[in-house]
Curated annotation (Swiss-Prot):
Belongs to the bacterial ribosomal protein bL17 family. This is Large ribosomal subunit protein bL17. GO terms for biological process: translation. One of its GO terms (cellular component) is cytosolic large ribosomal subunit. PANTHER family: LARGE RIBOSOMAL SUBUNIT PROTEIN BL17M, RIBOSOMAL PROTEIN L17. Keywords: Ribonucleoprotein, Ribosomal protein. Pfam families: Ribosomal_L17 (PF01196). GO terms for molecular function: structural constituent of ribosome.
Amino acid sequence: MAYRKLGRLAGHRKMMLRNIVTSLLKHGKIETTELRAKELKSLAEKMITLGKRGDLHSRRQALAYLLDEDVVTKLFKEIGPRYADKNGGYTRIVKTGFRQGDGAPMVLIELV
C-alpha cells in the first residue's frame, strides 16, 4: 500500500495521523499542510465509513485508532448517521495559501 512518509519515523507518523484524524472528527475542520491533509483524507473517510456501519466491531476498531472516546461516540451518534445516504467524499480540501515561516502549502480540510 502506498503512503507518504511525511519526514518521520513510522511510529511518529502513525501517532501524528491518529492525532490529526481525532482533531478533525472532534472539530469538523482543521488547517494543516497539503501533504498531511491528503494522507489524512483517506484515514478520515475510513473512520466515517466505520461510523456509518455502526456495529460493535466497527466501534471497537474506531476505539483502537482514535485517541478520544468522546470523539468515537460523536462519530457513531452524529457523524455516521449524517452521511448514511452518501458513498464517500465526506471531506473537502481547500487551499489557503502558504505558511509564513517555511512557505509550506497550507490547506483547510473539513467535513462536507
